[in-house]
Amino acid sequence: MKLLRSLLLIICCVHPVWAGITLNATRVIYNEKAKDASITINASGENRPYLVQSWLENSERNNEPAPFVITPPLFKLMANTTWQIRITKISESLPRDRESLFWLSIKAIPASDSTERNRMLIATKSVLKLIWRPETLDAAGASDAVKQVTATSNGQILTLHNPTPYVINIGAMRVN
């Protein structure tokens, strides 16, 4: 009973948050034939601007620069507006026989007002997959790639093997 009362009190005291930054995608696929790739950022809710910073990292997340440039890498996003980040390839060093994975990070920092007291503002960071798809690969092959993935079990360890040139996301998996 005490637990139920505590949960009810917490639920009643929590105020919903209707403001923030939203992105129009959960991943970006950059086709080699395209001039660039883009993602749209939307600021909604409160009348508060955001400072938005974006950058790319390679799949190993080491300090090696990604062969792309993001424009703009840093900008002010006003309340209730939409902005587009463009990703452009600047190097020919990418493999042409398989997809390549990079991480697109987008950090949004809300503006603070000196007149506001006792208010917590939280910066958010979204990390999305940027998948480089060379011209030799097509979307139809990507949807068939999951059929070629094999799984092997060694006790408590399940290992998946992807022999395809495609990056595969696993949303759900069932093991019998």
Descriptions of predicted regions:
Residues 19-42, 140-153:
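Beta-sheet-dominated interaction scaffolds and their linkers
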Residues 41-46, 156-164:
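Asparagine-centered strand-capping/turn motif at beta-strand->loop junctions
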Residues 2-10:
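Sec-dependent signal peptide recognition
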Residues 62-94, 176:
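Intrinsically disordered, low-complexity Pro/Gly/Ser/Thr-rich segments with frequent PxxP/GP/PP motifs
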Residues 92-137, 141:
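Terminal connector regions
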Residues 14-16:
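N-terminal signal peptide c-region/cleavage motif recognized by signal peptidases
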Residues 44, 57-59, 82, 88-92, ...:
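Solvent-exposed coil/turn segments that connect beta secondary-structure elements
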Residues 45-62, 164-176:
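Short acidic, flexible loop segments centered on an aromatic residue
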